[in-house]
Amino acid sequence: MELDVSNALSHPGQEFPFSGTQAIADQEIYGTIVQIDDCLVEGTFMADDEGNINVKGRLVTRAHAPCANCLKDASAEIENDFTEDFIRNGDPEDDEIFSYEGHRLSVEKLVMSYTVMALPIRFLCREDCPGFEYKDPDTAPVEPGIQYPFAGLKQLLEQSEEV
């Protein structure tokens, strides 16, 4: 999503409203792929006398990932407020600042950053998810006709323990 800031540059100190949606690519976080729906972004922007743009607003989206306990599908509502300054003709490779050139300002980096910062540490399918149910293989009843792929290894282990 890009903002046309030409009016703000012509009228420093005056706020201009904006709203729209911003797509965010899937994110890999600690080895887990998190899918993020399109973000609804709304707020205001204002230029200062040096051409820097202050952008403030709110983003709302939904993120999806496997449950940390049981690996079923889980999702979380993401809401985050932001206030950032975009530096005119700043270094676009600098990860510490937001920058823009000309009269158009892209909020993609801002939206992605603030969305990732608001993600939960762990996704849960429900608050009281018990996780996987552990079944002790030694006490589990053996059902006739079912083949257990590692049964042969268990026999080898038992034979090596006898020696």
Feature-to-residue mapping (PLM):
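Charge-rich, low-complexity linker and terminal segments
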Residues: 1-15, 75, 79, 86-163
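Aromatic-enriched hydrophobic runs in primary sequence
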Residues: 24-30, 57, 68, 80, ...
